[in-house]
Structure formats: structure tokens, C-alpha cells
Regions:
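Bacterial N-terminal signal peptides that target proteins for export
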Residues: 1-10
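N-terminal signal peptide c-region/cleavage motif recognized by signal peptidases
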Residues: 19-21
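A short beta-strand-turn-helix
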Residues: 27-43
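Short active-site neighborhood of thiol/selenol oxidoreductases, capturing the structured segment around
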Residues: 40-52
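Typically the conserved alpha-helix immediately C-terminal to a functionally engaged Cys/Sec
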Residues: 58-72
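Thiol-based oxidoreductase modules, predominantly thioredoxin-like and allied folds used
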Residues: 72-87
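Structural micro-motif
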Residues: 93-102
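Non-catalytic, surface beta->alpha helical segment in thiol-disulfide oxidoreductase systems
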Residues: 102-130
Length: 130
């Protein structure tokens, strides 16, 4: 009997985590068509110019992940541009280096930063999308 109760409670905990995770920002691999659609819909957008080998990008990941879970950023759409394989997109955004964060409110660019790993200033950048 206790074993069955533990199983039921475990399932309930997992289901709660899934339900609460739905409030996190949408994170997508960049493609021009989806980005244009998000802009046309007036969505708050973050573009990450990212490289898997970049230590600054790795330092930004947990900061962004925590911020994206906040209720005020639940409608944020995050597009990750691969610095090494998506050179056309990198060029289109005017990015010369990885670890660049660019924010938009619909089609209007609201800010950008390069190499920032300060949670407060990254939060301030994301605030410009709301």
C-alpha cells in the first residue's frame, strides 16, 4: 500500500513540474520565417547569438534559464542562432561575436549586449521586451 502511494505521489510531482514548466519562455532554434512571424505578431523576443564552445555563452545559459522561468517573461520567445553554422543570420543581426543578446518588442529592436554575464543587467535587457 505505501509503495502504491509513493508511486501516485511521484507521478503527481512530475505532472506538476510539467504544468509549471509551461510558463517558461518559448525557446526555438532560429529560422527566419519563425522569427518574422514572431515579429509580425508583436511578441517579445530574445535572440541569442550562441556557440557551443563559448565559455561566456555557457555562463549566460543558467542566467537566461532562470529569467525565462519568471512569470513576467512567460510570453518571451527566444531564438538561438548558432554562431558557427548560421552565418547568414549572424550577419543579418550584425553580430561579429558570439555571446550577443538582442531583444525586440515585435519588429522594434529594444537592446543588445555582448559578453554580459551579470544577471541584473541581463534582466534589465529582457525587461525592455515587456
Amino acid at each position: 500500500m505505501p509503495r502504491k502511494l509513493i508511486s501516485v505521489l511521484s507521478v503527481a510531482v512530475v505532472m506538476s513540474a510539467v504544468a509549471f514548466g509551461a510558463h517558461a519562455a518559448d525557446k526555438l532554434n532560429y529560422d527566419a520565417k519563425s522569427f518574422a512571424a514572431a515579429q509580425a505578431a508583436g511578441k517579445p523576443i530574445l535572440v541569442e547569438i550562441h556557440a557551443t564552445w563559448c565559455p561566456t555563452c555557457k555562463a549566460q545559459e543558467p542566467i537566461l534559464s532562470d529569467l525565462e522561468k519568471q512569470d513576467k517573461f512567460k510570453n518571451l520567445t527566444v531564438f538561438r542562432v548558432d554562431f558557427d553554422s548560421q552565418k547568414d543570420a549572424v550577419k543579418a543581426f550584425g553580430a561579429r561575436v558570439q555571446s550577443m543578446l538582442i531583444t525586440f518588442k515585435g519588429s522594434v529592436e529594444t537592446g543588445r549586449s555582448v559578453g554580459d554575464t551579470n544577471p541584473s543587467s541581463i534582466a534589465a535587457l529582457l525587461d525592455k521586451t515587456t
